[in-house]
């Protein structure tokens, strides 16, 4: 063995040890890198809309989750929407969305997952799925809601939660804002050097589930989204069954207000829901 090769071996070993240490750290801390909850406190629902109510959704595993409920005002049982938030903040960051959806004539349930908005527990794929099921059950049980006219709205990671829920409990319509194909694929956009498929504890495989959703689907993407590129949203809608719609909001990024309560997005949602049992006559 040459002297040069002898000197190279320790360098290779050091690089391997460092890489192994980085991967081990990321594996052990991955949920802290995926979920960014706000601890609260969250303001009252009535500070958003006068008729808003602070509610508690209880999961099968005993979690008591805070939420906001904004009932429609048309009388009788009517259409509603269940909102599944993205991976950051809490429901107060979606107040404008709740107001906008309520303005379409919908009752709106906006809830926080476990670990978010002062709720107990820690977020995980399995936990968020349980939270969404509990929220859907709560909303379906309201006297002013027609269970056959409930839509799901999912934002980013919440879109993956909504897809999983829709497979188990089909809605009247499914609206996905900035959805990705899988957590591994969106992660690879930001960390292409990591073997994410092997590392991830949570997967959110929407691309494998979307074809099993038996409901009309609307996908909305930001044309300049550098967190969840529109190409991933486009691939997801391509895998969905008909009827489906795909809308790109040009020049808009992942967290821009145009994807919270912007006119293009809301017009697309209104037109879409009017074509379904949610708002259709």
Swiss-Prot record:
Localization per record: Cell membrane
Signal peptide start-end: none
Listed InterPro entries: AB_hydrolase_fold, Hydrolase_4
Primary location group: membrane
GO cellular component assignments: plasma membrane
Keyword Cell membrane: yes
Membrane-spanning ranges: 8-28, 97-117, 147-167, 210-230
Pfam families documented for this protein: Hydrolase_4 (PF12146)
Keywords, alphabetical: Cell membrane, Membrane, Transmembrane, Transmembrane helix
Gene3D superfamilies: alpha/beta hydrolase
NADP listed as a keyword: no
Protein topology in the membrane: Multi-pass membrane protein
Protein family membership: To S.pombe bem46 and yeast YNL320w.
Protein's UniProt name: Uncharacterized protein MT2364
Gene source species: Mycobacterium tuberculosis (strain CDC 1551 / Oshkosh)
């Amino acid at each position: 063995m040459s002297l040069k090769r002898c000197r190279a071996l320790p360098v290779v070993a050091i690089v391997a040890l460092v890489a192994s240490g980085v991967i081990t750290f990321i594996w052990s801390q991955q949920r802290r890198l995926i979920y960014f909850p706000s601890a609260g406190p969250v303001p009252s629902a009535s500070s958003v809309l006068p008729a808003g109510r602070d509610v508690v959704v209880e999961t099968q595993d005993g979690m008591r989750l805070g939420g906001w409920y904004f009932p429609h005002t048309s009388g009788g049982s009517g259409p509603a929407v269940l909102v599944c938030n993205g991976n950051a903040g809490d429901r107060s960051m979606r107040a404008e969305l709740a107001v906008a959806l309520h303005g379409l004539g919908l009752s709106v349930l906006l809830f926080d997952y476990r670990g978010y908005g002062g709720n107990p527990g820690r977020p995980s794929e399995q936990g968020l799925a349980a939270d969404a099921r509990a929220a859907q059950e709560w909303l379906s049980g309201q006297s002013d809601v027609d269970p056959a006219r409930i839509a799901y709205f999912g934002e980013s990671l919440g879109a993956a939660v909504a897809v999983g829920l829709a497979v188990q409990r089909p809605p009247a319509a499914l609206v996905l804002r900035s959805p990705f194909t899988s957590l591994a694929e969106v992660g690879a956009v930001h960390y292409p050097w990591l073997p994410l498929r092997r590392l991830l504890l949570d997967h959110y495989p929407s691309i494998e589930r979307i074809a099993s959703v038996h409901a009309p689907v609307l996908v909305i993407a930001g044309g300049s989204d550098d967190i969840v590129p529109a190409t991933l949203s486009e691939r997801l809608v391509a895998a969905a069954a008909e009827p489906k719609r795909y809308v790109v909001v040009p020049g808009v990024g992942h967290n821009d207000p145009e994807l919270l309560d912007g006119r293009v997005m809301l017009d697309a949602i209104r037109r879409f829901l009017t074509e379904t049992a949610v708002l259709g006559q």
